[in-house]
Design a protein with these regions (language model features):
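Surface-exposed loop/turn motifs in large extracellular/passenger domains
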Residues: 1-166
Length: 166
């Protein structure tokens, strides 16, 4: 599946491929090339998928699009590939983000190049982290020595392996 369309919206859950991956969904070799401008102030934004549920697999999905979540008072989440993955039964293998994530500091810690909130013991490997993060109009300094600090919130970082920066 491929999305080449840009999104200009005011939705709480919006992505280039699928809003919510419910139980048992597999997204494989999906590519998002569309940029998302979202005016919602409390969204879960991911340019491949917003929310990932039990027994789902994300495999070799690539995001090339940007997310602009700079609506006044924004306090939602934003990640290049997904916003929230919360079940230990999810598998994430391969994939990459090359897009820019723009948001406000009111979003807090749930902003990342790859995801916003990786909230369990989810086996995750083989990803490429790239792109940029801009918060309150200021670009974060991301490089080969600190990129793991910017891939997104991780409840259990030991589950995340083989992530490279380009």
């Amino acid at each position: 599946c491929v999305n080449n369309g840009d999104m200009d919206t005011d939705l709480g859950r919006c992505s280039g491929i699928l809003a919510t991956a419910n139980t048992g969904t597999t997204l494989e070799d999906c590519t998002n090339n569309g940029d998302q401008v979202n005016k919602n102030t409390n969204g879960r934004l991911g340019n491949i998928v917003c929310n990932v549920s039990h027994y789902c697999t994300l495999k070799n999905c690539v995001n090339n699009g940007d997310i602009d979540a700079t609506a006044t008072g924004y306090k939602g989440t934003a990640g290049g590939i997904f916003a929230l993955a919360g079940a230990a039964t999810i598998v994430i293998e391969g994939g990459a983000n090359y897009g820019t994530i723009k948001t406000l500091s009111t979003a807090g810690k749930y902003v990342g190049l790859l995801w916003a909130n990786h909230n369990n013991t989810i086996p995750t490997s083989g990803l490429v982290a790239s792109g940029r993060i801009i918060v309150d109009g200021v670009e974060r300094e991301i490089n080969a020595s600190n990129y793991m600090e910017h891939i997104g919130y991780m409840k259990n970082p030991a589950c995340v392996t083989d992530v490279t920066w380009v």
